[in-house]
């Protein structure tokens, strides 16, 4: 339970700051705010090293969560600022791919160092060194001049992109089964009897995302945003139903089930990989340039809320029933998301898009 508190306080802190970070990034110069949040995020690794109590460690964890929420919105917004509009989808695709690689390499490297007998102090020092290198790279990025904006009265649309709410609902529904997958797929594989190393599931998922980023961004830049998302939705719907069916395939043929299991990972990687930059671009295109930060924070907040709901509902359904029922429920949610996107989000986007 203590570990759960430590892990969750980081996520909750990041989620709480996201709407406000969009407002600050739209109101003030973006790069200085981004670098300030990056610096705070970086120094928290030094804080972990000197933390002498669990309370202090949790406090540093919360501060790092807040700074992470700001850094993710800030980095994404800076990328949008420096990319020409004709290649924005492609740029967001490669930027997202770098995040996916980092999220895979980071935990893997930490576990490798820990298994090699390294102390947590050494691991935190390595993390601090990596952040310092990233901070230097971020400092070298040249951003365009952002003219001062007239201070508008505080209102809801300064924190949430109201025109993006339908897209946010669709994305939230889509991220619930994604959250179930990232947190419980290894337990699901063990429950149904797949003996292969389930860590390869995420490897294949990362490969799928990398493959999709090669071509999806360029298609988005040609204006086919809703078409790309629709294609990704069809692929993801099929994949989640196939994942839930693995419980029946295992009783027929273990080898076939294992192949299908890892094929699902590849398909999910491609499906989500083509949708990420498309969804991001969709939110940005619904917002004026002065609200790019708000658009990005709305996009990321929708995704994070869905991930959190997926963690909770997936665990609950598996507890009262089985994991395959949880993934079947997730597959049904993707159908709802697909129908809602095609019926509501796409028409709303084409009606309200600014570019």
Q: Predicted regions span which residues?
A:
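Cytoplasmic helix-loop-helix junction between adjacent transmembrane helices
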Residues: 60-98
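Helix-breaking motifs and short loop linkers at transmembrane-helix boundaries and internal kinks
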Residues: 29, 50-56, 224, 246-247
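Paired small-residue
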Residues: 55-63, 259-267
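Structural signature of the two symmetry-related core transmembrane helices
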Residues: 32-46, 227-242
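Conserved MFS/SLC helix-loop-helix module at the cytosolic interface between two early adjacent transmembrane helices
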Residues: 16-52
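Residue-level signature of mid-helix packing/kink "hotspots" within the transmembrane helices
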Residues: 11-19, 103-104, 206-210, 214, ...
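Helix-loop-helix hairpin linking two adjacent transmembrane segments in secondary transporters
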Residues: 94-139
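C-terminal membrane-cytosol helix-exit motif in multi-pass small-molecule transporters
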Residues: 128-147, 340-344
